[in-house]
Every structure is written in structure tokens, then in C-alpha cells.
Regions:
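Anionic-ligand binding patches
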Residues: 1-4, 11-200
């Protein structure tokens, strides 16, 4: 089975290939003319589905897309689907983290619950959805940076789910392997790898 990734991000492709190694699934990058999709849906699931359907129709192949972000309890789920562009420019991690800390100023740690969410969708060339999976990881938002692996909101996210070696550590403190064991993306990818062979 061959899947086209609804993203030109080579890092995402490498990550997927690692997860799907040993399965009969091959993931490839999309053609250069893959149209950009406006992520204007209210949920991660709907945005992932929209991107997967667009890529599947454009390429005539099964297509895989993802959408992910941070939901903070005290902020009623913000930044949510706007996580990457919350402070304005898409992908400005520093500005997004500044806004996060500003909005949580004065809020005690025990009221800073949050979760990362990742939604994955696979669509068929006719525009129907073949598979949807998701994963999440609970934690708290810290006042100070924790760890050196800067990516998105990771430097301020403390993983708090009980029963893991990684419990009580910041996402930015974890190695890539440790993070994939407990992260929203790792959990969604494991579910994808488990279910994907069944849609052939």
C-alpha cells in the first residue's frame, strides 16, 4: 500500500517511515504542485480530514494528513487549532510562548492543566475518509523554560501523566525516542500503524 503525505515536511515523512517500518505501507512526499489548504475548521480532526481529502483528490492516491496543537484548560482550550499561528505569524514559537505565559500570568501551577492533541486522517482518491485516529498527552504549563529541545510549546510543557518513566519531565527535556513514547503524536502514530493495514 502506498500513501502520499499531505505535507511537504521531510521530517514528518522520516518519522512516519520509522513508525511504519515492517508494515506493507510506503509513505511518499506529495508532488510540488500540491495545493495549500486553509486550516479553517474548528477541530484538529476536521482540519486533518480536510487536508487528507484535498491531497487524495489531487494525487489520485490514498493520502495522510495531520493536525495538532495545544489546549490549555484555564484558557478554555486555547490556542487549539490556532496553535501554530496564535500570536500572528505561522510557526513563530517564541511569540506564541510569550502569549501563552502572558495569558497565564498569576495562574497557579495546579490550575495550568493542558494537553497536546494530534489528529491523523487518511482519505481515498474519491474524497471519502478511510481512517481517523488521534492521540493526546496531559501535562501542565510551566512559568520557566524546562529543557533544551526547542519545538513549539515543548519548553513550557511538563508531562504529568502517572506511570511513565517520563512523568514529571518537560517535553523539551526528553530525547526524541522518549518523547515519541508518551507524546500525542507518538500515540496517534502507533494507532495509525495498528489500523492502517486494515484499510487495504
Amino acid at each position: 500500500m502506498k500513501l502520499v503525505l499531505a505535507s511537504k515536511n521531510a521530517k514528518k515523512l522520516d518519522e512516519l517511515r520509522r513508525f511504519l517500518a515492517g508494515t506493507p505501507v510506503e509513505v511518499v512526499l506529495p508532488p510540488d504542485d500540491l495545493p495549500d489548504v486553509i486550516e479553517d475548521r474548528p477541530t484538529f480532526r476536521e482540519n486533518a480530514a480536510k487536508k487528507a481529502i484535498s491531497a487524495a483528490r489531487h494525487t489520485g492516491m490514498l493520502a495522510l494528513a495531520d493536525d495538532s496543537g495545544l489546549e490549555v484548560d484555564h484558557l478554555k482550550g486555547e490556542p487549539g487549532v490556532r496553535s501554530a499561528r496564535w500570536a500572528g505569524a505561522h510557526g513563530d514559537d517564541e511569540a506564541n510562548n510569550r502569549m501563552l505565559l502572558q495569558k497565564l500570568r498569576g495562574v497557579p501551577l495546579h490550575k495550568r492543566g493542558a494537553r497536546f492533541v494530534c489528529a491523523l486522517a487518511v482519505a481515498r482518491p474519491d474524497g471519502t475518509l478511510a481512517l481517523e485516529v488521534s492521540g493526546s498527552a496531559r501535562g501542565r504549563i510551566l512559568n520557566e523554560r524546562c529543557g533544551t529541545r526547542d519545538f513549539g510549546y515543548d519548553p513550557y510543557f511538563l508531562f504529568t501523566e502517572e506511570g511513565y518513566e517520563e512523568t514529571g519531565r518537560g517535553f523539551a527535556e526528553l530525547t526524541p525516542e522518549e518523547k515519541l513514547r508518551v507524546s500525542h503524536r507518538g500515540r496517534a502514530l502507533r494507532e495509525l500503524a495498528r489500523k492502517l493495514p486494515g484499510i487495504a
